[in-house]
């Protein structure tokens, strides 16, 4: 299948919603490759905790944007957009269509919504100083510098608050003003999955992660990249590290990971509802509904 005009199909949804399996089924039917739009699966050695597609799954369909960067050299949104756009355009030249899959809403928006993030590298000294400030005070500071971003970023989301402040102090410009929109050179079809049993799916998948070796994977990351690796704050890895350090036990690590993942899923659903115009698929008939939408879109 090769459409007359390049087509990007974006399959989005909260974490643990079954996107990976559905994407593979869709890709097989329409003979497309898959681009994983995930802010963590792009890193080498972070497999179990990011629910990265397995080697068997990746052997069924070509997957791109997986295992691209070292955890010790994290990239920002601008870097990801540049890497991903090059890969997507190369794929579109060959096949005429491709499939994006992910739960990282901002990363998806950067690719299919024409978002143009600021090319401001992390400011290490400034970031270290900001991390010493209480979250409440950080958010108050952001309100003074960039009121619009302060409205959009949750007071507890210190990572995004610090990033917005970095951009302001490095450029003198508001993060919200820097993110201009530019036209994208392809057509986009947005599909979404949001199963009713999401919470039980999250619980089951989290338990599987720990059983498959999340603790051991975290230990390997610490041994390879150091105990202060920033990406160890990621959901799952953070709890595993706390358990390794003796701060919490196994049951507490599991419980906290499930709780944080449910909170993430809630934020993701809110983002997709407000920022995208997806056709939401019925979970029981997701594949036929997705294929029907794709064929209708292609005309």
Curated annotation (Swiss-Prot):
GO terms for biological process: tRNA modification. Pfam families: IPPT. The keyword Transferase applies. InterPro entries: Dimethylallyltransferase, IPT, P-loop_NTPase. ATP binds at residues 13-20. Residues 38-41 are annotated as: Interaction with substrate tRNA. It is an enzyme of class 2 (transferase). It catalyses: adenosine(37) in tRNA + dimethylallyl diphosphate = N(6)-dimethylallyladenosine(37) in tRNA + diphosphate. It comes from the Bacteria. Signal peptide: none annotated. One of its GO terms (molecular function) is ATP binding. Keywords: ATP-binding, Magnesium, Nucleotide-binding, Transferase, tRNA processing. Substrate binds at residues 15-20. Its EC number is 2.5.1.75. The record marks 104 as: Interaction with substrate tRNA. The keyword ATP-binding applies. Its cofactor is Mg(2+). PANTHER family: TRNA DIMETHYLALLYLTRANSFERASE. Monomer. Belongs to the IPP transferase family. Catalyzes the transfer of a dimethylallyl group onto the adenine at position 37 in tRNAs that read codons beginning with uridine, leading to the formation of N6-(dimethylallyl)adenosine (i(6)A). This is tRNA dimethylallyltransferase. The gene is miaA.
